[in-house]
């Protein structure tokens, strides 16, 4: 059985359940296109946190992820998968984006398994959550657009194979327009 469910619809439409909206992004502090741009318009405080993280850590974020509160909806967390140093036409190569996607999802998996912890001895995923998390991370539904396939130009089927590697550990709802 697949760990990926496809639905048609608008991923930004408010839902009545706890969810983590996952997107791939750059480490340069720019939510300038694709779903990231839509997130920036809708959740400017979350974008401010994202920019702060990027300014502090830069490319050291590659292969990591961070959870940000949306500040608008207490059931919505935003998960940034850091898969490329830069965005736009300066994005990384396809294989490195896929490798960093897998590493970042591994981090998310670790924190989901850690129940209500957002810090381990090696990493922190939720420095910005400060009371904005309602449930243990593992109870949030994981949702995403077809990550990497827009501005980063990675064929969706290749990212889909990375997601399938997490079968049994994480299930994803993928939104299609």
From Swiss-Prot:
GO process annotations (BP): DNA damage response; purine nucleoside metabolic process; tRNA splicing, via endonucleolytic cleavage and ligation
An annotated GO cellular component: nucleoplasm
Record field: transmembrane: none
Keyword Metal-binding: no
Cited SUPFAM superfamilies: Macro domain-like (SSF52949)
Function: Highly specific phosphatase involved in the metabolism of ADP-ribose 1''-phosphate (Appr1p) which is produced as a consequence of tRNA splicing. Removes ADP-ribose from glutamate residues in proteins bearing a single ADP-ribose moiety. Inactive towards proteins bearing poly-ADP-ribose.
Other known facts: Present with 1170 molecules/cell in log phase SD medium.
UniProt-recorded name of the protein: ADP-ribose 1''-phosphate phosphatase
Organism: Saccharomyces cerevisiae (strain ATCC 204508 / S288c) (Baker's yeast)
Gene for this chain: POA1
């Amino acid at each position: 059985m697949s760990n990926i469910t496809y639905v048609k619809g608008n991923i930004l439409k408010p839902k009545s359940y706890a969810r983590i909206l996952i997107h791939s992004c750059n480490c340069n502090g720019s939510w300038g296109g694709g779903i990231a741009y839509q997130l920036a318009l809708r959740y400017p405080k979350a974008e401010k946190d994202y920019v702060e993280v990027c300014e502090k850590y830069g490319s050291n974020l590659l292969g990591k992820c961070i959870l940000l509160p949306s500040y608008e909806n207490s059931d919505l967390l935003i998960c940034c998968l850091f898969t490329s140093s830069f965005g736009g036409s300066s994005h990384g190569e396809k294989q490195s984006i896929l490798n960093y996607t897998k590493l970042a999802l591994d981090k998310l998996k670790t924190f989901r398994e850690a129940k209500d912890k957002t810090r381990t001895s090696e990493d922190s995923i939720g420095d910005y959550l400060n009371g904005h998390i309602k449930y243990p991370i593992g109870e949030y539904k994981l949702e995403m657009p077809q990550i990497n396939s827009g501005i980063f130009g990675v064929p969706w089927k290749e990212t889909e194979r990375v997601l399938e590697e997490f079968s049994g550990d994480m299930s994803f709802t993928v939104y299609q327009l």
